[in-house]
Structures are given as structure tokens and as C-alpha cells.
């Protein structure tokens, strides 16, 4: 059913399937995006009440892999999205993301059960339940961030290796930059910022190589006159660095 894979003993992909269904429902109903915070993670979503964390990650995948193919596979129960995901990253990444979304879903269900149990428990028992709930919340936060980082690095590392034209360079830059609008962030989260700066440096070098006909030995970066595109890349990197510095100073 949907994006789920069934074995004799377990259903895989339930978290991704639930998130995709909710994203479709929110889009049909016309729910507007809202900034929310769950378990220390801040992000923008059009599903603030139902599976918000799962929807945030699924929305990242929809942006990178394609919203149409995600919804089509959900409705028709086929592997088109799965195959495109694997082609854009790897089978290992797909399985890790699928498993992580399931883990988040089940951990949230455990929190609901524990909250219900707490209403019928003694004070000492409640203290133990509260500790368990906090552990689950922290586990969810860490799983979310690890999964988000994996999605970023796996997709954009693969895409970088496929760049073969100057047009590809610009498309890559724009797609990585716009990913910021899909991020879930916590206090002190820097992975995306650090990755972006690193990739912009590599992209600058890649651009120079392609502009010189693919001949890396012909480059003389120090003496090369910067063009408008290279200047743009450097300005974007400086903006990220300046923003990070200001945040540190404000603390």
C-alpha cells in the first residue's frame, strides 16, 4: 500500500507513506506554511498538526527528487519514487532514510502511550515516565538531524559528480542554496552552513575547469580575472560566514 514495503514480519516505509499522504492532503486543502518547533527542531511546514517532523523530511525529498513522482508513487503504490531516489543517492541512503522515518513515527507513538500511562500512575512512576519521554524526544531530534544531514550530503555529493556543463553548475548552486527553505534547525546546528561553504569552494573550482574546456592543468586561479559568477559565489559564502559570526556575537 502506498510507499510501504511488506515482509512476512514487518512493514517498512510507513513513516514516509504517512508523511507523503499528509503532504498531499495539506496541499489539496490549501493549508498555508507555518513556522513551528517540535522537540527542539524549528522548521516551516504546511502540516503543523499531523506528522510534522516526518513531513519536513518528506518535503525535503519532494524538493530534491520530485513532488509529482512522490505523490504518484504514493497513490499508485509503485517503485518510481524509490527508484528515482536510489538513482539520485544510493540504495543505502534510501534504506537509512526509510528506516529513520519509521523510527521517528514509532517513537512519537511511544510518547503518546507514555503520556496516557502517566495519567494513571503514581508520582514516582510518573517521574520515570517523564525521563523516558525526554529520552525519546532527544532520540527523535538526533534521528531527524542525522537523516537530514544524510539527505543533504548524499544527494548533493552525487549531483556534484554529475556536473558536466556551466549550466549544471548554476542549477546545482541554486538547488543547494534553496534547500535552506526546507531545513529543520536546532540551536547550534551548522551542518548545512558548513556543507554549503565547502561545496561552493568546490563548485568554484569546477566552474573554472569547465570554463577552460575541462583542462584542469590550464588553470591559473591566482592570476585569473574573476568573472561575475565567481564573484557571486564568494559573496554568498561571505554572507553565510557573516551571519554565523553575528549569531555567535549575539549569544
Residue spans of the language-model regions?
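Pan-zinc metallopeptidase signature
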Residues: 44-209, 213-215
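Non-Sec secretion/translocation targeting segments of pathogen effectors
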Residues: 21, 213, 224, 228-251
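Short alpha-helix carrying the canonical HExxH Zn2+-binding catalytic motif
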Residues: 1
Amino acid at each position: 500500500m502506498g510507499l510501504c514495503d511488506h515482509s512476512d514480519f514487518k512493514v517498512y516505509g510507513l513513516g514516509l507513506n504517512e508523511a507523503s499522504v499528509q503532504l498531499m492532503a495539506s496541499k489539496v486543502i490549501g493549508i498555508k506554511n507555518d513556522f513551528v518547533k517540535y522537540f527542539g527542531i524549528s522548521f516551516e511546514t504546511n502540516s503543523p498538526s499531523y506528522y510534522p517532523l516526518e513531513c519536513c523530511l518528506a518535503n525535503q525529498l519532494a524538493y530534491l527528487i520530485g513532488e509529482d513522482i512522490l505523490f504518484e508513487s504514493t497513490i499508485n503504490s509503485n517503485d518510481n519514487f524509490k527508484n528515482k531516489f536510489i538513482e539520485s543517492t544510493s540504495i543505502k541512503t534510501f534504506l537509512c532514510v526509510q528506516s529513520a522515518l519509521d523510527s521517528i513515527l514509532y517513537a512519537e507513538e511511544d510518547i503518546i502511550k507514555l503520556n496516557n500511562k502517566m495519567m494513571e500512575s503514581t508520582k514516582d512512576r510518573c517521574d520515570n515516565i517523564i525521563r523516558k519521554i525526554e529520552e525519546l524526544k532527544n532520540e527523535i531530534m538526533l534521528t531527524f538531524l542525522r537523516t537530514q544531514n544524510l539527505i543533504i550530503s548524499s544527494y548533493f555529493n552525487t549531483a556534484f559528480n554529475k556536473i558536466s556543463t556551466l549550466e549544471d553548475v548554476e542549477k546545482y548552486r541554486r538547488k543547494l542554496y534553496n534547500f535552506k527553505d526546507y531545513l529543520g534547525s536546532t540551536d547550534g546546528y551548522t551542518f548545512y552552513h558548513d556543507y554549503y561553504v565547502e561545496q561552493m569552494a568546490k563548485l568554484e573550482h569546477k566552474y573554472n575547469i569547465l570554463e577552460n574546456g575541462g583542462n584542469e592543468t590550464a588553470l591559473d586561479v591566482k592570476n585569473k580575472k574573476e568573472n561575475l559568477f565567481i564573484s557571486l559565489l564568494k559573496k554568498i559564502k561571505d554572507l553565510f560566514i557573516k551571519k554565523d559570526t553575528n549569531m555567535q556575537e549575539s549569544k
